[in-house]
């Protein structure tokens, strides 16, 4: 945990046991939502080491988010050192390979008191961790999604392209409504035209049609996911045509297969999408071949199971060890 006053440099961080924070009721993060977070995982690799996957990308995304929200960016080296030190101090909580991961939550917030709507006078950066079980128990399984015409995640010119804490609470009710109707999550459409797919809850969307992979382009309303960019690079290296473009919901519902990606699931197959009175099922309810290939190969890269892939270092995506047994 480290602090920084507005206009100063970040001070040295210190390691401490997990505990409650002391914040003023006037803290900027409490009153105005001036804060952001990142989501990462430390995993047990095939060789027994504990590895992180492209953590420098999280550090850079956090810097961009901090600038957008008027907070002092955390230097990349400081961010990475904080993450690695926290993981090292919690190695006993990293599950065996394939049994889960140590989830890592870097958090940057305006902790200083400010009554007016303005940047906080002081900021706090911290990293905490928690062990989590495998996202898919028994293997990757297709999920069902519902397209929302009522709710939108973000609008042009807003903060949809950064991992701001205020982006997530508004999605809780739509998600709860979808689950009540038997669906796993919501597909959000764009707020301007109400017809282009943006995100799936807190995940990035992809669809495959006649061997061509499409994903919504980054226009400031969609989070630039680390898994998203990794899937794009990996798919292109395997010879697939990948387009970052506007993806109409009708095009996606006519696709051969669809999937979404994120830190938690890596790649999640979409088995069914409902929009209005239309319901489409993909691949007979099974995982599509392209989806499965990308899931297996990216997971292999993340866990250093290199027997399943070729030339991972050329992609610049190989995980690196923070601690070797």
Predicted segments, located by residue:
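Positively charged, low-complexity/disordered segments
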Residues: 311-313, 318-325
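Extended, Lys/Arg-enriched charged tracts that mediate electrostatic binding to polyanionic substrates
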Residues: 97-105, 109
């Amino acid at each position: 945990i480290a602090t920084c006053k507005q206009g100063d440099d970040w001070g040295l961080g210190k390691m401490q046991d997990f505990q409650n924070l002391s914040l003023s009721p006037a803290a900027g993060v409490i009153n105005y939502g001036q804060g952001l977070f990142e989501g990462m995982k430390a995993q047990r690799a095939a060789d027994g080491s504990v590895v992180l996957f492209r953590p420098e990308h999280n550090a850079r995304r956090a810097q961009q988010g901090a600038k957008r929200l008027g907070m002092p960016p955390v230097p990349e080296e400081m961010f990475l050192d904080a993450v690695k030190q926290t993981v090292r101090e919690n190695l006993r909580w990293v599950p065996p390979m394939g049994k889960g991961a140590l989830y890592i939550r870097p958090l940057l917030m305006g902790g200083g008191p400010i009554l007016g709507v303005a940047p906080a006078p002081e900021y706090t950066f911290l990293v905490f961790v928690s062990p989590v079980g495998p996202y898919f128990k028994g293997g990757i399984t297709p999920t069902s999604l519902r397209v929302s015409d009522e709710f939108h995640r973000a609008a042009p010119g807003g903060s949809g392209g950064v991992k701001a804490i205020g982006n997530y609470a508004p999605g809780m009710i739509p998600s709860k409504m979808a689950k009540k109707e038997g669906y796993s999550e919501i597909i959000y459409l764009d707020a301007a035209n109400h017809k282009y797919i943006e995100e799936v809850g807190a995940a990035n969307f992809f669809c495959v049609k006649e061997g061509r992979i499409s994903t919504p382009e980054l226009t400031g309303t969609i989070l630039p996911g680390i898994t998203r960019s990794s899937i794009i690079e990996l798919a292109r290296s395997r010879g697939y045509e990948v387009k970052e473009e506007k993806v109409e919901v009708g095009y996606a519902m006519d696709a051969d297969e669809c999937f979404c990606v994120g830190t938690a699931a890596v790649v999640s197959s979409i088995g069914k999408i409902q929009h209005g009175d239309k319901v489409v099922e993909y691949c007979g309810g099974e995982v599509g071949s392209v989806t499965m290939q990308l899931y297996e190969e990216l997971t292999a890269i993340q866990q250093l199971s290199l027997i399943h892939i070729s030339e991972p270092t050329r992609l610049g995506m190989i995980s690196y060890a923070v601690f070797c047994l």
